[in-house]
């Protein structure tokens, strides 16, 4: 994909499907879990392909030093990832603003403007990755404990998994969290399967095994979806 046709939402969604079709909205939009319903065609309403170039991975680390993270750790992980990626993968001779189009750092972390995207995100396309941390999780992890988070890759970014994993390994080796004191070693990488389970594809720095990195879509779709908001959502338009 030359650009990533994705919409980044500041809300986590959980879908449940039912058989009957109607539209309903329950409750006012507040900071709490709240369901609402949307209508779907029983066939393929968007004429989607059989597969989408999306893969979800889980990165496991073994901590060598105590790690202290804020309640919502994804922002912290994104920050250390960006700094480590810039140091490891930027191919520009001098700092560029914006980076050159073929710079791996730019392709992953700061995508160039793309005319094929909607106007609201044309100049600043969403990056082709998402970092997902548990909504409810401890903030302190002692040395010797494990720490894991999910990484969703879109389009061509899936083929950069070895680079991205190596960059996260460098970030954890250097330190993150409070005072950059938390350190750890990458102990495993797993990919999510169609049934929701995770399959280990690398352990302790071993080469990443070949694996399916697509989402396969169903041939038929239910007529109703129930969406449960797990984080606050503000609908502007």
What name fits each language-model region?
Residues 1-42:
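Intrinsic disorder/low-complexity segments
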Residues 40-237:
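RNA-interacting cores
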